[in-house]
Design a protein with these regions (language model features):
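Intrinsically disordered, low-complexity terminal regions
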Residues: 1-277
Length: 277
């Protein structure tokens, strides 16, 4: 039995070592290199790459990095998905970025680890989804018919959006700062996520739970349905009608002069009516 435990420990240690990337530092001499890629609809980015998005007629990538690091920037195609990552643990560099050209077929971007994603121009697509994890950062302007954002872990997103239909889901400790104009928006915040939102929404479906917080004092919704639970907090302005479901120790600060319907109001929930500024 002791031999089995010893063998298991050695095997686990070997696997952990095998999965650990070799560390490398950049030369500080920057070089650019273009790489051919297959057409893609989805983009997955990992590690600590800086990504710049630009729209074009054909899919392409251009790497700008320290000359000894370019070979470690990997691009792999799997079906309709392009995956970008590094094969080494790059501890320092003068430049480590990839300019990604997407087309009208672009559907989804997934960002993980410490990636930094910036759209160099407005993303104008019918339907696009962004998913962020770990410590990823996302900066973009978008004009779409349907827009979906799912931010998780400690990722941060800054967004300027015009969309007909918007779906946003924040969880864990994700943060969103945004200016949004949308016909309809479903907005869910969970755990310790935070939203700082301005803009105009016609129909808003808002859900908050756990310790989530929303600062929407400058977000004007014509109609809203709000569900607040746990220790969540929300500041929001509603113009015409609001339906409220509040429980736990949730707190809602309501601005504007809407018709208020208390559908459910239990436990230690607090609703405070605030004057419009």
């Amino acid at each position: 039995m002791k031999n089995i435990f010893t063998l298991t420990f050695i095997l686990c240690s070997f696997l952990a070592f095998a999965q650990k990337k070799e560390k490398v530092k950049g030369s500080k001499i920057v070089k650019m290199e273009q790489k051919e890629v297959e057409n893609f609809q989805n983009l997955e980015v990992e590690d600590n790459l800086e990504i710049f998005l630009v729209k074009g007629n054909e899919c392409a990538i251009e790497i700008e990095a320290d000359d000894n690091l370019i070979e470690y920037v990997e691009s792999k195609s799997a079906g309709n998905t392009l995956k970008l990552s590094t094969s080494r643990d790059i501890t320092s560099s003068k430049k480590l970025s990839v300019r990604v050209t997407y087309t009208d077929d672009f559907k989804m971007l997934i960002a993980k680890n410490e990636t930094n994603i910036t759209a160099l121009s407005d993303i104008t697509l019918d339907n696009i989804t962004f998913k962020t994890y770990d410590y990823a950062k996302l900066f973009l302007n978008a004009k779409t018919k349907m827009f979906t954002l799912m931010a998780n872990d400690k990722s941060k997103v800054e967004l300027n959006l015009k969309s007909e239909k918007t779906t946003i889901d924040l969880s864990k400790s994700a943060q969103l700062k945004a200016l949004i104009s949308s016909t309809s928006m479903k907005f869910d915040l969970y755990q310790k996520s935070k939203g700082d939102i301005e803009g105009d929404i016609i129909d808003l479906d808002l859900t908050l739970d756990n310790n989530a917080s929303l600062d929407g004092e400058k977000l004007v919704a014509k109609n809203a349905e709000i569900k607040a639970e746990g220790y969540s907090t929300a500041k929001i302005m509603v113009a015409t009608k609001v339906i409220i479901n509040a429980s736990g120790k949730s707190e809602i600060q309501l601005y504007g002069e809407p018709k208020i319907e208390l559908k459910r109001f239990t436990e230690s929930a607090v609703l405070t009516k605030k004057p419009s500024k």
